[in-house]
From Swiss-Prot:
Pfam families: OsmC (PF02566)
Protein name: Organic hydroperoxide resistance protein-like 2
Membership in a protein family: Belongs to the OsmC/Ohr family.
Superkingdom field: Bacteria
Biological process per Gene Ontology, one example term: response to oxidative stress
InterPro entries given in the database record: KH_dom-like_a/b, OHR, OsmC/Ohr_fam, OsmC/Ohrsf
Lineage: Bacteria, Bacillati, Bacillota, Bacilli, Bacillales
């Protein structure tokens, strides 16, 4: 891909009850189907948790950059992202939804919403999902 500044590779085997790992084995994680989906659940992760973790960290980084560009250093951004696996009636399969809850300190609700929207436009995960999954933004200023 043109203009790549970073890439990473993950390999999976065994589907939802298998494992995912990097070729150099610096990341190795067992997977388990959640009980809600008929699986064993347990302490292992699943694709939705991995997606939520990546999206949350990326969104928080984008928001922190926006805040820094606006010379705001005391907002202490917290980003909580819930990824839902939803039934897709168009093909009797599944689709994803995302609920993004952001808390910012020491600013007005209006400013918090403005900065979160800017981060949502800038975040690579938000760009990748825009128009593809339902996303709900919930912003709280404290």
């Amino acid at each position: 891909m043109a203009n790549s500044i970073y890439s990473t590779t993950m390999i999976s085997n065994g589907g939802r009850d298998g494992r995912v790992f990097s070729p150099d084995n610096t990341f190795v994680q067992n997977l388990a189907t959640p009980k809600e989906m008929g699986g064993q659940g347990g302490n292992d992760t699943n694709p939705e948790q991995l997606f939520a973790a990546g999206y949350s960290a990326c969104f928080n980084s984008a928001l922190s950059l926006i805040l820094s560009q606006n010379k705001i250093s005391d907002a202490n951004p917290e980003v909580e992202i819930t990824i839902e696996l939803l039934k897709d009636d168009t093909d009797n399969g599944f689709k994803l939804g995302a609920d993004i809850k952001v808390t910012l300190e020491n600013m007005s609700q209006q400013d918090a919403e403005k900065f979160v929207e800017q981060a949502h436009q800038f975040c690579p995960y938000s760009k990748a999902t825009r128009g593809n999954i339902d996303v709900q933004l919930d912003v709280t200023a404290q």
